[in-house]
Amino acid sequence: MKAEGGDHSMINLSVQQVLSLWAHGTVLRNLTEMWYWIFLWALFSSLFVHGAAGVLMFVMLQRHRQGRVISVIAVSIGFLASVTGAMITSAAVAGIYRVAGKNMAPLEALVWGVGQTVLTLIISFSRILATL
């Protein structure tokens, strides 16, 4: 896939490139490219967190009559909600970078993507603790 505007550099849209930070030394110039890299980091970090929480819930509720079903439903809804939020915030961050005329390094996309998951965790725990 070619980049927009006369620039003949390739857009890095491979999941393997994103997760391995293979494009070392390159910069992300396109809005699509920035959004995709940030979103994939948010997606996979959220998948890791929700997977760990799901395993913990499944183990702790294995003797409960409906515990397995509750675990799957709770983790699925939580994951879908966080991925939906990650889509929107990744687009917002990429849009701000694009409007500002800045390029993004692949490591910055990692920080923004994983940072979204960390902020989601902090907000989620603070909301739970407030209800106790």
Curated annotation (Swiss-Prot):
Glycosylation sites: 12
Tissues in which the protein is found: Expressed in normal breast tissues. Down-regulated in breast cancer cells (at protein level).
Gene Ontology CC terms, in alphabetical order: plasma membrane
Cytoplasm found in the keyword field: no
Compartment annotation: Cell membrane
Cytoplasmic topological domain residue ranges: 59-68, 126-132
Cysteine pairs bridged by disulfides in the record: none
Extracellular side: 1-37, 90-104
UniProt-listed InterPro entries: Transmembrane_pr_170
GO terms of biological process kind: negative regulation of canonical Wnt signaling pathway; Wnt signaling pathway
The UniProt record lists the keyword Signal: no
Residues that span the membrane, as ranges: 38-58, 69-89, 105-125
Alphabetized UniProt keyword annotations: Cell membrane, Glycoprotein, Membrane, Transmembrane, Transmembrane helix, Wnt signaling pathway
One Pfam family named in its UniProt record: Tmemb_170
Membrane topology per record: Multi-pass membrane protein
Quaternary structure and partners: Interacts with CTNNB1.
Family under the similarity heading: Belongs to the TMEM170 family.
Physiological role: Negatively regulates the canonical Wnt signaling in breast cancer cells. Exerts an inhibitory effect on breast cancer growth by inhibiting CTNNB1 stabilization and nucleus translocation, which reduces the activity of Wnt targets.
Annotated protein name in UniProt: Transmembrane protein 170B
Annotated source species: Homo sapiens
